[in-house]
């Protein structure tokens, strides 16, 4: 579904643009899909042709951001608009944590979603963006349930469990998805009095804690990101509870991006069918080189950004 049709469907179903229901509904429409990082229009067209449900427009994929260092900021508006013009699927773009003016610019450009991203250099170490002030839906990362609920309380319409972006090492994504799922399971077993205590421990609003305990899930869509480089990685994260996949460097840093992109899309759809997974894992060529997360010093880990 292209971005215009998606927006029209959200309005027809929910009746009003910019409300929490509409923004969460737009995120729901991406469930079960793969969102791919792209840096040029040709990559965006490859992603769309491979079955991606959306693309993330940025000037450097996370592995290049990590390798080149320096301050990483919002992408150039001309580059973002060239991606928007190249595809019919939704386009996301990243703003720095806390940089509400970058978010204002991205909304003005007409992106379909904004990712307040730890991959970029944070602009504010005490405040995230007040996402309620925007009509465009926001995506935010989280390493645990408390972090996820704080972002939702700020207006996030989608949460992605944080892996370590730009590494090709899925271990952090696994750790944080298990942490979120484990925290949710724990809440479902608590009494009302214990949930008050849990809300304080999580530094999260009691109302959201109650909702999670009652429904056994987050109140918004939960994707995963960071380190996913193979079809098997994508399928594992779906089996662990992700409702969709972000893939950054793993596709366009591989030897055959189009084939790997299509394989990861298929693995995300048929994540519980080992026969399909074996088939799509064949003949993909070399995956991205990758970095062992354990070799990265804690202060240099992107997933630790945010609070």
UniProtKB/Swiss-Prot annotation:
GO molecular function, one term: pyridoxal 5'-phosphate synthase (glutamine hydrolysing) activity
Amino acids binding D-ribose 5-phosphate: 37, 166, 227, 248-249
EC number(s) per entry: 4.3.3.6
Sequence positions that bind D-glyceraldehyde 3-phosphate: 178
Pathway involvement of the protein, from the record: Cofactor biosynthesis; pyridoxal 5'-phosphate biosynthesis
Subunit structure: In the presence of PdxT, forms a dodecamer of heterodimers.
NCBIfam families in the cross-refs: PRK04180.1 (NF003215), pyridoxal 5'-phosphate synthase lyase subunit PdxS (TIGR00343)
Family assignment from sequence similarity: Belongs to the PdxS/SNZ family.
Protein name: Pyridoxal 5'-phosphate synthase subunit PdxS
Organism this protein belongs to: Mycobacterium leprae (strain TN)
Lineage: Bacteria, Bacillati, Actinomycetota, Actinomycetes, Mycobacteriales
């Amino acid at each position: 579904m292209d971005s215009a049709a998606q927006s029209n469907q959200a309005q027809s179903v929910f009746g009003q643009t910019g409300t929490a229901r509409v923004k969460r509904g737009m995120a729901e429409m991406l469930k079960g899909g793969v969102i791919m990082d792209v840096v040029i229009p040709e990559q965006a067209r490859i992603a769309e042709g491979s079955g991606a449900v959306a693309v993330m427009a940025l000037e450097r994929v996370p592995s290049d951001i990590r390798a080149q260092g320096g301050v990483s900021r919002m992408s150039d508006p001309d580059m973002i608009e060239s991606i928007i013009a190249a595809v019919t699927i939704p386009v996301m773009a990243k703003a720095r944590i806390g940089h509400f003016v970058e978010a204002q610019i991205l909304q003005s450009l007409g992106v379909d979603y904004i990712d307040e991203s730890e991959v970029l250099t944070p602009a504010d170490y005490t405040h995230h963006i007040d996402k309620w002030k925007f009509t465009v839906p926001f995506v935010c990362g989280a390493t645990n349930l408390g972090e996820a609920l704080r972002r939702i309380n700020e207006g996030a319409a989608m949460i992605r469990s944080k892996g370590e972006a730009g590494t090709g090492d899925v271990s952090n994504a696994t750790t944080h998805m298990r942490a979120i799922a484990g925290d949710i399971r724990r809440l479902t077993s608590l009494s009302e009095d214990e949930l008050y205590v849990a809300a304080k421990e999580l530094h999260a609003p009691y109302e959201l804690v109650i909702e999670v305990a009652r429904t056994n899930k987050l109140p918004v869509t939960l994707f995963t990101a960071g380190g996913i480089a193979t079809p098997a990685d994508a399928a594992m994260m779906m089996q662990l509870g992700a409702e969709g996949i972000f893939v950054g460097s793993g596709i366009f840093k591989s030897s055959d991006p189009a084939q790997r992109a299509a394989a990861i899309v298929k693995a995300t759809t048929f994540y519980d069918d080992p026969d399909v997974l074996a088939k799509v894992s064949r003949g993909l060529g070399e995956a991205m080189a990758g970095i062992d997360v354990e070799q990265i010093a804690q202060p240099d880990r992107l997933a630790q950004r945010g609070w």
